[in-house]
Amino acid sequence: RWLKNDIIRGNFQPDEKLRMSLLTSRYALGVGPLREALSQLVAERLVTVVNQKGYRVASMSEQELLDIFDARANMEAMLVSLAIARGGDEWEADVLAKAHLLSKLEACDASEKMLDEWDLRHQAFHTAIVAGCGSHYLLQMRERLFDLAARYRFIWLRRTVLSVEMLEDKHDQHQTLTATVLARDTARASELMRQHLLTPIPIIQQAMAGN
């Protein structure tokens, strides 16, 4: 888990070779457990095998960024439609509760703790909305896309949560989204969600270009 988090957070760079000697020292683990962890990360497309004996951090590209985020945005929009059609009173209450918790976190500092807490509440808010769809398999597919987007999202997360202006904009978006979902305006809620999930793209593109 620590290795996965370090890759997502950019502590290991794309295409960087993962030397077993460094990993055993860093995580105080034996070669066996590390190979298991690396095999799992290969399956998750965060690590690639080099010549069947070594490992590297998987590459990142603008093409992959656009593909993953487009897939996520369209998947989330569909799930919102289903959630509005199927969700009951308990679903509405959970969406409201998670929206409230997210809105309470307004502090803006550079600590990892702040980033983690905001992201946890942000994920919980979005998960509460789509949970109303009632489909275990669709939610599994959504989680898979979320994992694929994780490294790109963390680039966006650092730039967004550490900016008062951007954080306020996100707060406004979440308020509008919550109100529209609870009003059960399916068409508008779906489109708002789709656009909401696409907004990080320009920020990530700038960061990847070194701007």
What do these predicted regions represent?
Residues 49, 122, 169-171:
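Short, flexible turn/loop "capping" segments at secondary-structure junctions
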Residues 62-66, 83-89, 109-114, 157-165:
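A ubiquitous short alpha-helical element
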Residues 26, 161-211:
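C-terminal regulatory/effector modules of DNA-binding transcriptional regulators
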Residues 36, 76, 122, 174, ...:
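Acidic active-site catalytic centers that drive phospho-/nucleotidyl reactions
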Residues 1-85, 137, 205-211:
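Short linear motifs at protein or domain termini
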Residues 89-156, 173-180, 188-200:
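Conserved amphipathic alpha-helical segments that form helical-bundle/coiled-coil interaction surfaces
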Residues 62, 73, 96, 168-172:
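Amphipathic alpha-helical repeat elements characteristic of tetratricopeptide repeat
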